[in-house]
Amino acid sequence: MTDARLELAPDRIVAPPWARRLATLGAFVANGAGIGCWAAAIPRVKADLALSDATLSVALLAFAAGAIIAMPLMGLFAHRLRSGPASVIAGFGFAAALAAIGFAPSLEALCAATFVAGATHGAMDIAMNANASDIERRWGKPIMSSFHAGFSLGGAAGAVLGGWLGGFGTVWGLTGPALLASLLVAVSAPVLAGEGHGFGGASFVAPSRRLLPLAALAFVSMSTEGAVGDWSGTYLARSGVAPGFAVAAYAAFSLLMITGRIVGDRIVAAAGTRATVGLGALIAGAGLAVSATWPGLVGGVVGFGLVGAGLANVVPVIFSVAGRTGPSSAVGIASAATSGYAGLLIGPVVIGAVASAADLRSAIVMLAAVALIAAAFASSRAGGLARGR
């Protein structure tokens, strides 16, 4: 029996469940590796083109704009090609765009390349998460966090490999990881080609009342993640920590986020979606409060590490629920992901504005308060999360 709004097309699943899961995991690792190598290449790109902070921000904004524009349109893309093939096409496009960034001779060319990279990253993000949501539904138990653990591990590997190869030149730092990401996508492609749902009705709809709470939680979670990534090192440095050690805060954040995602499926299965998100946001808020009230290296590592542990499974759970809530997995996840990516862009800017008006510690306190409010919201019925999975 089909939904009244849609006419679901038959599934085109030809591979066994474990092969579908591994292939989709490969797409997550490839996507994370691309983001990691781009993050590692930013300082070298800035130096190669002699960009100021202001002009570099234009290129970074182009990447974000490409992603935000592509994500809501991915419902149409997944409708035409299904989420599996869409992941493959977007994955190859993302790798090619990353390689093109290394060859950009000017700011204009750089912005064009970063816009395409952002758009293909965003498209791949929606397609692979939609596919993961379908696989999780068939699997019969929570597995979304394991996919996001693959993304985080890929990001760490891409950053390390890109940083090392970048010593031989910016082009190597981007094309090397991009080629490996392409290889992962190519290996996964035969399975992904038969993956995903298609549907016969409208392929994109405005977020429904059931999706809006999930989109709001995604916005808060990813804005917090972006703020920690951009400001944790600066906060420790202003607290008197030597620059070489200030990176320890973000390292603790990333390590505990990866660890939390590796064990996240068991947590969700045992605690349910509402408790996982609510408690996770509470832990993140507590971690930010620790960092604000205990300045210095130890307080920063403990506090921001708790933030990583708390946020680890918030976005995977939200995407999983959104994929089951929307008219299709692609549309539901696109609604949450677009809001989340906007938060990733806006969060650091708001923290910077508050830090300029008051100080960075006050901005961290504000972020802690927002996380605690999100914890209360997620724990209530209004948060759109069930007590079970």
Mark where each language-model region is.
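Pair of pore-lining "gating" transmembrane helices in MFS-fold secondary transporters
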Residues: 14-41, 47, 115, 208-224, ...
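Extracytoplasmic gate region of multi-pass secondary transporters
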Residues: 38-39, 209-259
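Helix-breaking motifs and short loop linkers at transmembrane-helix boundaries and internal kinks
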Residues: 50, 82, 103-108, 294-295
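Conserved MFS/SLC helix-loop-helix module at the cytosolic interface between two early adjacent transmembrane helices
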Residues: 69-105
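Helix-to-loop junctions at the C-terminal end of transmembrane segments
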Residues: 70-82, 166, 260-273, 355-356
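Structural signature of the two symmetry-related core transmembrane helices
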Residues: 85-99, 275-290
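Intracellular juxtamembrane helix-capping segments at the cytosolic ends
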Residues: 122-137, 312-326
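Symmetry-related core transmembrane helices of the 12-TM Major Facilitator Superfamily/SLC fold
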Residues: 172-190, 362-380
